[in-house]
């Protein structure tokens, strides 16, 4: 399981179709389909009903967890960025 697979599934859930998800991810539909299929194979569950384009119950659970993972990664990046760009030093004020 990798982040690209989770991002592809999340995009399908949000966009409503594989082709719309591909446009959102700036890739081709076959890449999105491959990522989702590999994720399904690894988990041993169908995550998207191909006839309707909707998530299965298992897909809903995976997307919910994937969103949390994506949020945590964004938070991690922000924390590290703020540490790297932290302003430090003395501030001196003078009054007359």
Label each PLM-derived region with a short phrase.
Residues 40-57:
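A short LG(V/I)-centered, amphipathic sequence patch enriched
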Residues 28-38:
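Residues within the DNA-recognition helix of helix-turn-helix
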Residues 2-5, 29, 59, 66:
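The N-cap/first-turn positions of alpha helices
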Residues 12-26:
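Short helix-boundary/capping micro-motifs
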Residues 23-24, 41, 60:
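Alpha-helical residues within the helix-turn-helix
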Residues 81-96:
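Interdomain hinge and pocket-entrance segments immediately C-terminal to HTH DNA-binding domains
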Residues 5-12, 62:
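Short alpha-helical "packing" element that flanks the helix-turn-helix/winged-helix DNA-binding module
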Residues 42-43, 62-84:
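Alpha-helical linker/hinge and terminal dimerization helices associated
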């Amino acid at each position: 399981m990798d982040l690209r697979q989770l991002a592809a599934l999340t995009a399908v859930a949000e966009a409503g179709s594989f082709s719309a998800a591909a446009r959102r991810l700036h890739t081709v539909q076959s890449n999105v389909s491959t990522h989702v299929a590999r994720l399904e194979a690894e988990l041993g569950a169908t995550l998207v009903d191909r006839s309707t384009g909707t998530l299965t119950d298992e897909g809903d659970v995976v997307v919910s967890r994937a969103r949390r993972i994506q949020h945590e990664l964004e938070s991690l990046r922000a924390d590290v960025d703020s540490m790297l760009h932290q302003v430090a030093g003395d501030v001196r004020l003078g009054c007359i």
